[in-house]
Amino acid sequence: VLVDLRAMREGWLIVANVKDRAQMCGIFGYVGQPAEVGPMVLGALKQLEYRGYDSWGVAARDGGHVAVEKQAGKIGTAAVTLPTSSIGFGHTRWATHGGVTDTNAHPHLDERGRLAVIHNGIIENFRELRDELIARGHQFRSDTDTEVVVHLIEDLVEAGASLADATRQTFGRLHGLNAIIVMDVTQNELVAVKTISPLIVGLGRGANYVASDTTALVEYTRDVVYLEDNQVAVIRPDEVILLDLHSGAPLPLRRERVDWEVGDMGLGGYPDFMSKEMAEQGRVVRQVATGYGDYVRALADTIWESYGTFLVGCGTASYAALTGSYLFSRIARRHVNAVLGSEFKYQEHFLTDRSLALALSQSGETADIIEAMVTSRARGAKIGALVNVRGSTLDRMADLSIPLGAGPEQCVLSTKAYIAKLAILTLTAHTLAGTAEIGRDILLRAADALDRFLAEGGSARVRAVAEQIVKADHLYIIGRGLNYPTALEAALKIKEVSYVHAEGFAAGELKHGVIALLTEGTPCLVFAPMDETRADILSGAMEMKSRGGLMIGISPQYDPVFDIHLPVADVGDASPIVNALPAQLLGYHLARLRGYDPDKPRNLAKSVTVK
């Protein structure tokens, strides 16, 4: 899907449906006065490492050639020794083409060491292009799709094209959703172009920047240009020129100001970002309860006026959406549809010009959700967004965008952004029902309960449980009603971070096959709130126990069916919020006990721009 955000805002739209993909990588570039570009670029990449951490690389001009340092693995405590330079860029990779090796890390150079390229995306026709280039005598060093770009540009530059024109022509030959930045050591400029994969140009004084995320720019400037699809940016120390990809005609520069605080990017004394971000969840819920009245009233009014509301998410966000469907039904007596972003296209025929499509996304860049929103707009529906990253694609394309306000979430796993979504949806449902004060009250109780759980040794209690089950191969989790999605999210969190096979189920489905999986000693997690689901949940837990399950109850009140009880506060309809924390901690401690990094699980990246 190719998106023209300006066109969407102005009421017209051009959409091209394509079977393309973009990968998740972090990009940062600088052009300006001579500086220690190596440490500058590497520092920015550390802030972007959540986008990919298979390998990394930086490059700078060193006289008449490109100096490069790159290696496989996480950045960690790495340092670089690149020379002082007026131009440099870097890349942190999430591998899709070619193994995780030093050679396959970006940047990639032409054969003369004059040009360098970094790339985010997947070039669908790279084999065809590679064969063509090999036939013309080009030598390839890597197994990546990216390297075809630098060789194509090399041929055009040697034939007399400017760097901008060579980049335009090359990008036009690439099939897929891609973003590239090109450096030519004979020119003091970077050239950038993209489709879907985000690129933001930072406008400084005597220097300009480009990055895949605003968080990497705000240390240097808050004046930015969000590069739109099929725009080419020529970035020089004293100017930025925008060109149309197809015609090469100049385009107006739409300068915007980053007027929000990015938040604390440091560990703040915590051993890792996951533990820090779990500890911040009470603050996040309290912030929604006390400061989001206008936001939720606007969202409640929009839902009230809509005929057909779709909550659209992927992964953790999809479970927040599913919880939302229960909240609106239970509290506001309003039917809303929870739909996976990747499955939305199969239900789009229900959309009308009175529908509301509400996107839930931490990054605001999730490709499947962007596609769903573009489809919704094409059918005349209103677009809403709950996003954590201000200035992201979904934030800018929405008619109504509500910031999650969770602050930077640098652990690849989503914790506090998930909780923020639940809090906003809970308060919106109560506002729609005319019981906003009740909603605020239960959120404040939930915020206090989250803080109290940690302050009163909850993490240590969960660690003791993790020590007891650390060698288990399987973990099964049940919930009902509001806490059925909680069971699904708990299973996802545990398997993402600890690599223990975990599955969540609706408790009523036990008799329909799930119970066949249980063996003696299998750990089973049970969410048993003090609501109308409790009796049935405990009955299901007894069935599991009778088949040998080790029952771990997350509940405000002990029950004899529990072999282990993890007490939580009774906060009514906010129970999914307080129940999430023990499950997050269980995954965290299992990961630590098994020797895994909770911030950077294998094969995962946070900003999922892959379709």
Question: Where are the language model's segments positioned?
Answer:
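Conserved short alpha-helical segments that host acidic/polar catalytic motifs at enzyme active sites
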Residues: 13-267, 271, 280, 286-290, ...
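Short helix-capping/linker segments at secondary-structure and domain boundaries
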Residues: 34-37, 155-162, 188-189, 430-439, ...
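Glycine-rich oxoanion-binding loops at beta->alpha junctions
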Residues: 91-103, 286-300, 324-360, 366, ...
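Acidic/histidine-rich
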Residues: 177-207, 470-496, 531-533, 538
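Active-site phosphate/pyrophosphate-binding segments
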Residues: 274, 280-310, 379, 400-523, ...
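Glycine-rich phosphate-binding loops that contact phosphosugars or nucleotide phosphates
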Residues: 301-445, 480, 527-573, 586
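Internal helix-turn-beta structural module
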Residues: 570-592, 596-598
